Amino acid sequence: MAHPIDIHVGKRIRLRRTLLGMSQEAIGAAIGVSFQQVQKYERGVNRVGASRLFEFSKILDAPVSYFFRRV
């Protein structure tokens, strides 16, 4: 069962990605994972580690704190 925080972070990743018009394939290629892995992160199925979240923050041009807003 996914933890509510993991689900929230995943939703924030998806929101930011879609606001920037990026595909799951593009962001996956940028951080070195498959688009399927990006899907799992966005659904909260797989937990995003600290280093991976830092990569997301750079690529999505958002501070790490962005992903925890409104928790």
What are these regions (language model features)?
Residues 13, 27-28, 38-41, 67:
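Conserved hydrophobic/aromatic packing and binding residues within compact polymer-binding modules
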Residues 60-71:
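Short C-terminal boundary/hinge segments that cap the last helix of small helical domains
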